Curated annotation (Swiss-Prot):
It is a single-pass membrane protein. Belongs to the cytochrome P450 family. Glycans are attached at N444. Pfam families: p450. Cytochrome P450 monooxygenase; part of the gene cluster that mediates the production of the antimicrobial trichothecene harzianum A (HA) that plays a role in Botrytis cinerea antagonistic activity and plant defense priming. The biosynthesis of harzianum A begins with the cyclization of farnesyl diphosphate to trichodiene and is catalyzed by the trichodiene synthase TRI5. Trichodiene undergoes a series of oxygenations catalyzed by the cytochrome P450 monooxygenase TRI4. The lineage of its organism: Eukaryota, Fungi, Dikarya, Ascomycota, Pezizomycotina. Disruption phenotype: Impairs the production of harzianum A and leads to the production of a larger quantity of the aspinolides B and C, as well as other secondary metabolites including additional aspinolides and their degradation products, gamma-lactones, and hemi-ketals. It comes from Trichoderma arundinaceum. This is Cytochrome P450 monooxygenase TRI4.
Length: 517
């Protein structure tokens, strides 16, 4: 029988020593198992990665999103398949992408390790289980179909008109314009119009610093910490906000944004119930009596709203900004695009339908090159084949193993995209003429059964926005170089390092509006 009194007599130093010894033994056993007994022991890769999450933690958390480039070095040394941590395999082979991100009947879960940092457990995008994800996506699909997006075109055009008025005001005032901020405000207004049924006038914010943009930037800074230590981030969230702002400001920004989403959602829900109008995703999908009650809770509304605003704001706005950088850096490309846009029938304020614009080959090439070189989310989003092993060449990947491939490697594959770091709209025109389906290699929105639900809306925003800005204004880059877009940190999406002398830590694209055209 255990003698409690005897335990009390153990000297503290002895107790600490015993605890350290037990911890060391556990660590040694875990490392031994992962290296020599684990089902992935035959997959190539560095032993330091195989023993646990330690190498990844160092490069992602302590070095701020650097593991992507370490994985690139692993592939250079070990080949196209590597074990990037104790439990996950990464494949750098574009031809294998659709095997990982499949659209077939194979049950494919999301890796739980990739969703915890977002703290949106009931959102469709964070749903781990294959069947539950399919059901939740089915509730939302009608609101993001091509037909639904076509119905949103007047709203997008109205917001672009507001954006152009901000451009013109900066021209009159001879002020420098933040393209990052302007495009973030535009895309945030569009997605809030879709989600809530009305936009939130973020384009009216004088400096374009609004709560959604600041909230996403806050999330990007804590994303990797949240993946590895979700309890630490959760504990910080429980503190008073004034204290959080002192200890860790990014979490305060994130909490402020979620509070606004919740308040806006409840307000819209209340108005819609009294009017009977179902004009938004929130009201239409999440109050549908055909949807199970547990799927129509306030908590789920908040989770879905958070993801919609993040995904619908930052990725599209960064793509627009990077596309504009390349256009303004390459006058020949810019002039070719202007000439093509002149071929469109005359219209008020250069407003044309998405259908008209998608028939323009050079604009289509510009949009796809912008998508390719902005990458979208580049952090690994692993998939898990739950019931069957996958085969990659001579390597068998056991069922239940998280497997990933980053968009970064697909979009810079020299066999698919020669001169991958060059902005070449012509490559898309030539591919179309040669019957090459190059578009299938654009993976910003992922592919398969978990492809981003908002991809049609993002395309619409890009086509419509570029088609109206380019003919309307002569813009000039201001104190902005390629260092402002070169990706050096993988935090959900890719960000450049902070440029000395700039105020923004996540990149800053600035222009002068020279004249109206």
């Amino acid at each position: 029988m255990l003698d409690i009194n005897a335990l009390k007599e153990i000297p503290p130093a002895t107790a600490v020593g015993a605890a350290v010894a037990v911890g060391a033994l556990y660590f040694f056993c875990q490392c031994f198992y992962n290296l020599y007994l684990h089902p992935l022991r035959k997959i190539p890769g560095p032993k330091l990665a195989a023993i646990g999450p330690y190498l990844e933690f160092y490069h992602e958390v302590l070095r701020d999103g650097q593991y992507l480039w370490e994985i690139e070095k692993m592939h250079q040394k070990y080949g196209p398949i590597v074990r990037v941590n104790a439990r996950e395999v990464h494949v750098k082979d574009t031809s294998y992408y659709n095997t990982i991100y499949t659209a077939g009947a194979r049950k494919t879960n999301k890796d739980p390790a990739t969703v915890g940092a977002f703290d949106v457990p009931t959102a469709t995008a964070a749903t781990v289980d294959h069947d539950l994800h399919r059901a939740r996506r089915g509730y939302l699909n009608p609101y993001f179909s091509k037909r639904a997006v076509a119905g949103l075109e007047p709203t997008i055009h109205e917001r672009i008109t507001k954006l152009l008025s901000r451009f013109d005001q900066h021209r009159k005032d001879d002020q420098v314009l933040s393209l990052d901020g302007a495009f973030s405000a535009l895309t945030a207004d569009v997605i809030t119009a879709r989600f809530y049924g009305e936009h939130k006038d973020y384009l009216d914010v004088p400096d374009f610093h609004f709560v959604v943009r600041d909230g996403f930037q806050g999330l990007s800074r804590v994303y990797h910490l949240g993946r590895f230590l979700p309890s630490v981030v959760g504990a910080l969230k429980g503190l008073p906000k004034f204290l959080i702002r002192i200890i860790f400001p990014p979490i305060a920004e994130l909490l402020t944004m979620r509070e606004e989403i919740e308040a806006g959602g409840i307000d819209e829900f209340t108005k819609s119930k009294s009017s009977g109008i179902k004009s938004s995703v929130l009201v239409g999908a999440l109050s549908d009596p055909h949807i199970p009650p547990q799927e129509r809770t306030v908590a789920r509304m908040l989770d879905e709203g958070t993801v919609f605003l993040f995904a619908g704001t930052e990725t599209t706005s960064r793509t627009l900004g990077i596309t504009m950088f390349y256009l303004l850096s390459n006058p020949d490309i810019l002039n070719k695009l202007r000439e093509e846009l002149k071929s469109l029938p005359p219209s008020d304020d250069n407003m044309h339908s998405l259908g008209q614009l998608e028939n323009l080959p050079y604009l289509t090439g510009v949009v796809h090159e912008g998508l390719r070189l902005s990458f979208g989310p580049i952090s690994r989003s692993s998939r898990v084949a739950t019931h069957e092993a996958l085969q990659y060449k001579e390597h068998t990947i056991p069922a239940g193993t998280p497997v990933s491939q980053s968009t970064y490697f697909v979009h810079t594959d020299t066999e698919i995209f020669p001169d991958p770091w060059e902005f070449k709209p012509e490559r898309w025109i030539k591919a179309a003429e040669d019957g090459v389906a190059l578009k299938k290699y654009i993976t910003n929105f992922s592919q398969g059964s978990r492809q981003c639900i908002g991809y049609s809306m993002s395309f619409a925003e890009m086509f419509l926005t570029l088609s109206r800005i380019i003919p309307a204004f002569d813009l000039e880059l201001y104190d902005t170089t390629k260092a402002d877009i070169d990706m050096t940190h993988a935090r959900i999406v890719g960000y450049p390092k902070k440029v000395p002398g700039k105020t923004e830590s996540l990149g800053e694209l600035r222009v002068k509006v020279i004249k109206k055209l």
